């Protein structure tokens, strides 16, 4: 348990930041899941629309430090490849 005033404040800050990060990570995963569900259903138009909305969310998560930049790029790249394969 935190004893000093500064340690107590840091505990509060960490809890607040954790909640924000959890929300951002969940939002990113939701957008990714929408793309994957559209791909699984075989609907190319819906998948493309979902991908266009998911890409900025994934990159925003990387800018906020939720995921690494390369991880975000890899996720976008793989989703894009799957959507393109669906259209072909």
Curated annotation (Swiss-Prot):
Domain of life: Bacteria
Pfam families tied to this protein: Ribosomal_S20p
InterPro entries named in the record: Ribosomal_bS20 (IPR002583), Ribosomal_bS20_sf (IPR036510)
Purpose: Binds directly to 16S ribosomal RNA.
Protein family: Belongs to the bacterial ribosomal protein bS20 family.
NCBIfam families for the chain: S20
Stated name of the protein: Small ribosomal subunit protein bS20
Organism: Methylobacterium sp. (strain 4-46)
């Amino acid at each position: 348990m935190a004893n000093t005033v500064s340690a107590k404040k840091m505990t509060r800050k960490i809890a607040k930041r954790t909640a924000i990060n959890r929300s951002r990570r969940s939002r990113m995963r939701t957008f990714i899941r929408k793309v994957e569900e559209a791909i699984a259903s075989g609907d190319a138009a819906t998948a493309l629309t979902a991908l266009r909305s998911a890409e900025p969310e994934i990159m925003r998560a990387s800018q906020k430090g939720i995921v690494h930049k390369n991880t975000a790029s890899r996720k976008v790249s793989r989703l894009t490849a799957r959507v393109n394969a669906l259209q072909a």
